[in-house]
Amino acid sequence: MSLSIKNSGDYMSNIAFAFTLSTLAGLSTLLGFLPLLFNLKDESSIILKSLAFASGVMLTVSIIDLIPESYNLLASIFKGFPALLLLLIFLVIGIIFSILIDKFLPNNNNKLFHLGIVSMLAIILHNIPEGIATFLSASTNQKLGLSLALAISFHNIPEGISIAIPIYFSTKNKKKAFLYTFISGFSEPVGSLIAYLFLAKYMNNFLMSILLSFIAGLMIHIALFELLK
């Protein structure tokens, strides 16, 4: 699939679609709260399986959709090796960004409430650029935007679990667990709003390719070193 930034006659008609996708993708985080509504016999097994599934989805979308799309956009501007080099540079930057989030928001497994808060902050930092990418992708290419939104939705569910469960078991307060999970998910449409207000009018093939490769790096690191650790 290919993006066409220049042929943007129907761009405005895609704005509502893009906002809807990013909002649904973000609020899918709330599905991570659902286990608290049931008496699960093997909760740890469910969490592990959902994390593994989300990791597979994120890797698949990054490798099959985001990276090829980023390269195609770069190849329309730069021929041959420069396009590949730029893709790799911003892919690595995305990975480094995710690593820095882990470094400066350390995970303390001995304190459940702290774990839930740290998870929420880390996920908010992940969700804002994902919201930007979803909005900009969907507003120019609905298929790419839908693919990205689905992948984000799948990995947002176990991320919701990583917030809701520690918060609940540390406070015994389902309302608080729901609220913190909601705040995390709502950061995704906030990212879309940022994209619409400040970034959309400056977007072109080069900037879109940078964003896609950056998000691919971010998602690859999350998939391999956070969801599976």
List the predicted regions and their residue ranges.
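Intrinsically disordered, metal-sensing/regulatory segments
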Residues: 1-229
